[in-house]
Amino acid sequence: MSSTEDDRQVRISKIAGRYLVFDIDDVAYIRRQHGICAVFTGTMPQNPTQNVFLGLPLELYAEDAKMLLDRKVAYIADDPLEHLTQLKSMDDETRKSYLQSIKTQRRTAQLVFNEAKAQSMAKHKDKRKPKQPQPSVVVPTELPLSASSADGVAAAVDQEEEGGAEFLLESSSSKPLKTDASTPPQKPLVKEKLPAITPTTSNAMISNGTSNPDVENHTALPLYSYLNERGYFITPGLRFGGDFSVYPGDPFRYHAHYMANSYGWDEKIPMLDLVTSGRLGTAVKKSFLMGGQKPATEDSEAGELRAFCIEWAGM
């Protein structure tokens, strides 16, 4: 892990009770370093009428946000309040700094575009320029000329030379050459043209605050942290009938191995729920995982977490 990632603080925006991440670099960081996938909830600019492929922002579970806070790699910001406060108190210096950051992003986009264009032109240069066939060299053969034909050729050559000389004289007299080269032609000043961009975040406008609103504690947090610390990736499990879908690695590479539910340590679990969950997990080719943590007491903190897997073996 690089030093920049060691000091990285992920900004989690709390909006209407939801925990959202708007920066694509933060999304890549928490997925790569902390095994958090979460769910994209934004529309794609190229095709906003579909909901199969979604984009930023990334919506986190409350368990995700709490876990990142405990690891001290993120902070939660009350986004509406911070934006209103900053916009009302923005001075000229802050405004200039924000505009300069936008211009820097535009220059970066232009450099990336120019580099991609140069690579594309170099790649397709040979395809656009077909090879020219080599002209064949014909060696003329010497033929004997008669006296009359030789005189005719000489006369034609003399006439062509005289006509060429007259043409040169006429062109030189009608269009005199300019010899004054002391003042070179001045090029008109061209204003720098940069591509227009739409900023995806407003981080450059607001300061990096450290306000951390309270994150509600869910009963599923112990099981969630237990699985994450062991390298499992977790996504919503509604489509498989559980609270979570648990993957042994990145979901881009693996299928889910478990559908997981969290229970309280003293919570009574109906036997019918165990049977139906076990059968459902086996039907979707997964194991049903259930777990709970021993609660804290006056003498000790929260104890160990126990997890069990259930499979339906058949009749």
From Swiss-Prot:
Q: What are the EC numbers? A: 4.6.1.16
* Annotated GO MF terms: lyase activity; nucleic acid binding; tRNA-intron endonuclease activity
Q: Which reaction does it catalyse?
A: pretRNA = a 3'-half-tRNA molecule with a 5'-OH end + a 5'-half-tRNA molecule with a 2',3'-cyclic phosphate end + an intron with a 2',3'-cyclic phosphate and a 5'-hydroxyl terminus
List the cysteine pairs that form cystine.
Answer: none
Q: GO biological process: any one?
A: tRNA-type intron splice site recognition and cleavage
The UniProt regions of compositional bias labelled Basic residues, in chain numbering, are 122-131
In Pfam terms, one family for this protein is tRNA_int_endo
Q: Any idea which UniProt keywords this protein has?
A: Lyase, tRNA processing
Q: Which domain of life is it from?
A: Eukaryota
Q: Where is the active site?
A: Y247, H255, K286
Region Disordered, as annotated, extends over 117-138, 169-188
**Compositional bias per record (Polar residues), positions renumbered to this chain:** 170-184
Where is it found, in Gene Ontology cellular component terms?
Answer: tRNA-intron endonuclease complex
Quaternary structure, per UniProt, is: tRNA splicing endonuclease is a heterotetramer composed of tsp-2/sen2, tsp-1/sen15, tsp-4/sen34 and tsp-5/sen54. Interacts directly with tsp-1/sen15.
Family, according to the entry, reads as follows: Belongs to the tRNA-intron endonuclease family.
Report the protein's function: Constitutes one of the two catalytic subunit of the tRNA-splicing endonuclease complex, a complex responsible for identification and cleavage of the splice sites in pre-tRNA. It cleaves pre-tRNA at the 5'- and 3'-splice sites to release the intron. The products are an intron and two tRNA half-molecules bearing 2',3'-cyclic phosphate and 5'-OH termini. There are no conserved sequences at the splice sites, but the intron is invariably located at the same site in the gene, placing the splice sites an invariant distance from the constant structural features of the tRNA body.
In terms of PANTHER family, this protein maps to: TRNA-SPLICING ENDONUCLEASE SUBUNIT SEN34, TRNA-SPLICING ENDONUCLEASE SUBUNIT SEN34-RELATED
Q: Under what name is this protein listed?
A: Probable tRNA-splicing endonuclease subunit tsp-4
State the encoding gene: tsp-4
